[in-house]
């Protein structure tokens, strides 16, 4: 039986990794915004951040709150509808549920910091529409499903807004906004798991349909280029007032190019983007904070890494 063949019996699982590496890991890493203390963040916001830093953080956080619902719907409606296997559907429903937790948590941050007077930083509309058109698919043709799943998993879950996550993390490395930083850490670990398992599902599709990788190649390359364009424009918008004390826009753009290459390789394709390796390496702390070590180790998240048991690390160790 293949991925698209219905199996009435719950077990035995034909694709057990979507249970053990997907559903179970996400379940073990369950968290809620109520676990995060924001008292220190409010004090930092009122007493330590300057106006340009407030402008940056406030507009980023408002943008986050507007993006999570669509991501949840993709997992719970599209993926569940396409793949009848119980182990895949369970994983997708768990991932979608976790995205709703992100939405509530971002709203909590916005309310706690009082961000009603800020305007959300969002991806540039025309370019974002081009990307959405590549993700959008409502049919049942394997090529359409594979293209949509690959682009969504690799880029929407694995690259989109990672520049903003990195900006917010950079404050925690200065011992500021630790509550925001903790939430970003848990959120990015979730997104990274979702991306990893979605890419793996695409690779499984390619194993069962040997033409699929080539059939989707052009659209996926276009999507990768579009995502890098989106992120670079977004970085320009975030840094319109100038670089941060410990983070440069140029370094962040190189990091995004490197990360997009990594996701392309995860899908089974070759790297597409050239980048400044030294500048990109200035963001190696991002891999540490999101549950990996550096580079290729990032996607081999061990159960002890992907849990809340290890959250008490000293951020001075990053250096």
Tell me the role of every PLM-derived stretch:
Residues 1-319:
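Non-heme di-metal
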């Amino acid at each position: 039986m293949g991925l698209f063949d219905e199996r009435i019996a719950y077990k035995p699982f034909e694709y057990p990794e979507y249970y053990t590496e997907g559903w179970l890991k996400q379940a073990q890493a369950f968290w809620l915004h109520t676990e995060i203390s924001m008292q220190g963040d409010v004090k930092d916001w009122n007493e330590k951040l300057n106006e340009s830093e407030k402008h940056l953080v406030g507009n980023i956080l408002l943008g986050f709150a507007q993006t999570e619902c669509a991501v949840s719907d993709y997992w719970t409606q599209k993926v569940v509808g396409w793949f009848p296997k119980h182990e895949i559907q369970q994983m997708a429903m768990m991932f979608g549920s976790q995205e709703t937790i992100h939405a509530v948590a971002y709203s909590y941050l916005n309310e706690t910091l009082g961000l009603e007077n800020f305007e959300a930083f969002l991806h540039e509309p025309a370019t974002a529409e081009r990307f959405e058109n590549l993700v959008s698919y409502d049919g049942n043709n394997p090529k359409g499903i594979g293209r949509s799943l690959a682009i969504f998993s690799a880029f929407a879950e694995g690259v989109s807004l990672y520049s903003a996550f990195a900006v917010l993390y950079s404050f925690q490395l200065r011992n500021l906004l630790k509550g925001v930083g903790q939430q970003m850490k848990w959120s990015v670990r979730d997104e990274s798991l979702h991306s990893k398992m979605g890419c793996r599902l695409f690779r499984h599709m390619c194993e069962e349909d040997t033409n699929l990788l080539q059939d989707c190649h052009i659209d996926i390359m276009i999507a990768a280029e579009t995502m890098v364009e989106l992120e670079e424009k977004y970085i320009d918008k975030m840094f319109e007032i100038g670089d941060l004390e410990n983070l440069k826009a140029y370094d962040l753009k190189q990091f995004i190019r490197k990360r997009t290459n990594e996701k392309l390789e995860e899908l089974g394709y070759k790297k597409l983007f050239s980048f400044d390796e030294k500048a990109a390496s200035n963001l190696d702390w991002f891999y540490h904070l999101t549950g990996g070590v550096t580079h290729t180790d990032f996607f081999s998240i061990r159960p002890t890494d992907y849990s809340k048991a290890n959250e008490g690390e000293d951020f001075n160790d990053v250096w």
